[in-house]
Regions:
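Fe(II)/2-oxoglutarate oxygenase catalytic core
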Residues: 1-178, 184-210
Length: 210
């Protein structure tokens, strides 16, 4: 299914997704409490996000597999100017019973660049240099979530997106479903009532909007 701000692909090969889930089990020993806010300033806020996650380098074969479908979806639906997976890493996320992630955006106003200038001071050249050295000319444009668990393996845990009219879209729970959406779209993972929900999520960056 393709909309202006969201794209679902439910036709990824089951045998590849099954192999991916098995191969990623080596990362289970590295799971930590998920944080909100991102970067070095991320904090654990279980009233907002209660889950476990770790990071997968984009040198892992799963990243190349996912990137193929990201490019396919972008070509067929978004046509955004994109470059790569942010930070050269993907997030391996696990939700157990009672865990969830409330409504949020992957690119909100708080995520935009703020020059390091003291109040009352203005140094355009310094600002420009700081802007470039921090690589802030790239921003999140697309987000993706690949479902590794089958819908029969857990209850609840629906992935949902919210449009500007307040309408909620619920993504399929089928294993191998790739959900690709505009990083500015509000989304959530509802509370898992039973079982375990596993996924790979990541963010696709590109030149800042003009």
């Amino acid at each position: 299914m393709a909309l202006q701000s969201v794209y679902y692909d439910t036709l990824l090969p089951e045998e590849v997704i099954s192999l991916m889930e098995k191969d990623l089990q080596v990362f289970d020993d590295h799971l930590e409490d998920s944080r909100v806010g991102g970067g070095e300033g991320g904090v654990v806020e279980e009233n907002v996000r209660d889950a476990k996650n770790t990071w997968i380098p984009d040198t892992h074969w799963s990243a190349g597999f996912i990137w193929h479908y990201v490019m396919k979806a972008n070509r067929e639906n978004f046509l955004y100017d994109i470059t790569n997976i942010q930070g050269s890493t993907m997030q391996y996320t696990v939700y157990g019973e009672g865990q969830f992630y409330n409504w949020h955006q992957d690119l909100g106003i708080s995520g935009f660049y703020k020059p390091n200038v003291l109040p009352g001071q203005c140094d355009p050249q310094s600002n420009a240099t700081d802007f470039i050295t921090r690589e802030t000319e790239y921003i999140r444009k697309l987000s993706f979530s690949l479902q590794l668990s089958d819908g029969d393996e857990y209850e609840g845990g629906q992935f949902q997106l919210l449009d500007e009219t307040g309408k909620i879209y619920t993504a399929p729970k089928r294993r191998g479903t790739l959900i690709l959406f505009d990083a500015r779209a509000s989304h959530r993972v509802r509370k898992v009532r039973n079982g375990t929900r596993k996924s790979i999520v990541g963010w696709i960056v590109g030149p800042r909007w003009k």
